[in-house]
Amino acid sequence: MIGAIAGDIIGSVYEFDNIKTTVFPLFTRKSNYTDDTIMTVAVTDWLLYGGNLVQVMHRYGREFPCPMGGYGARFGQWLCETNPQPYNSWGNGSAMRVSAVGWAFGSLEKTLQVAEETAAVSHNHPEGIKGAQAVAAVIYLARTGKSKQAIRELSPIH
């Protein structure tokens, strides 16, 4: 989770202004967290304390309504709905918020199941689910000491 949040903050200044170099300052005065950090913390809160995932995500969305870069248009609408439904997104938002799932469980199967659950509340398109599962699986496999080669072979998406 720390890596996901640090990466989000480091990349925040380049989100809409891509660079083509590996030499850049990691943190600047303009660096800040984005919607991806907010939803990563929301998912982690849900993993730790339970409750209804949609309600937890809505609470964080209300508490942090204007992150740097904003929420995606459809996700922003989803946050405003009183009865939010999945909207078949195949975007990367589900993958961006799932990192804690890779640390939370003792089996790859459970990790994949919960990654799907965290994705499906909004990103219920098969690609949105696969993205979340891939990120959570790679984190789980690395955490459990698998080699790079084994991670490539065992990752459900490669």
Functional labels for PLM-detected ranges:
Residues 1-157:
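Structured, active/binding-site neighborhoods that engage oxygen-rich ligands
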